[in-house]
Regions:
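Conserved P-loop NTPase "ATPase switch" module shared by AAA+ and STAND
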Residues: 116-141
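Alpha-helical sensor/transducer elements of the RecA-like P-loop NTPase core
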Residues: 26-27, 52-56, 139-188
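A short hydrophobic beta-strand->loop->alpha-helix junction that borders the nucleotide-binding pocket
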Residues: 43-44, 65-75, 82, 99-103, ...
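Conserved adenine-nucleotide phosphate-binding loops and their immediately adjacent elements
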Residues: 1-31, 93-97
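Conserved NTP-binding/hydrolysis module of P-loop NTPases
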Residues: 76-97, 111-115
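A short beta-strand-to-loop transition that corresponds to the Sensor-1 phosphate-sensing loop
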Residues: 44-46, 131, 160-165
Length: 188
């Protein structure tokens, strides 16, 4: 399997904002606070505007790395391949390493991605993970996200859109530490 051909590039492009978006002042105020938090969590049921809020959040950052998660991304290798590809160009070698080493190479590949992000990003940036609820019960993916958040450079922020708060020790710890800006359906 050639991983670069398994990556659907359109999932890595932020959707275009709808021209009829209703902008709520309070929501804009909350979104503008995302700079103060490593992680912004937008959770609400279907149809409440999570993706729309994530699109609006993009406007606060010069560099946006987007990943729209779909059901097939429950495969950890495919998930990691998309995550790596969200930071192209410059991460092609990590796809090759993942392809050659398989799932056993994920630790070194993830470390390589963290190092790439740390040296490549020189300004505030955001990684958006839209529809994270589709993979939130995959232990390996949660561990990778935990490693990324724990070792991120200070100018990289994460935004996660999901239907419920992920029930993992890392999310609980981050919320207790005040690392998470939480936006709910009441705010949307």
């Amino acid at each position: 399997m050639i991983l670069s051909e398994m990556v659907i590039r359109s999932k890595l492009i932020p959707p275009q904002p709808n021209q009829t978006i209703f902008h709520r002042g309070r929501l804009k105020d909350q979104l503008s606070k995302s700079y103060d938090y490593p992680l912004t969590l937008i959770h609400a049921g279907t149809g409440f505007g999570k993706t729309t809020a994530l699109i609006e959040l993009n406007g606060y950052y010069n560099r946006v790395h987007w990943y729209h998660i779909t059901e097939p991304d429950r495969d950890p290798t495919l998930f990691l391949a998309h995550l790596i590809s969200a930071f192209l160009p410059g991460t092609e070698y990590l796809l090759t390493r993942l392809e050659e080493g398989g799932i056993s190479a994920t630790r070194s590949v993830l470390n390589g991605l963290i190092n790439h992000i740390t040296t490549d990003l020189e300004e505030e940036a955001i990684l958006v993970l839209d529809d994270y609820h589709l993979v939130s019960d995959v232990t390996e993916i949660n561990r990778w996200l935990e490693q990324l958040v724990e070792h991120r450079p200070p100018y990289l922020h994460f935004a996660i859109g999901c239907r419920q708060i992920p029930d993992t020790p890392a999310f609980i710890r981050w919320r207790v530490k005040g690392m998470v800006l939480t936006i709910t359906q009441v705010d949307l």
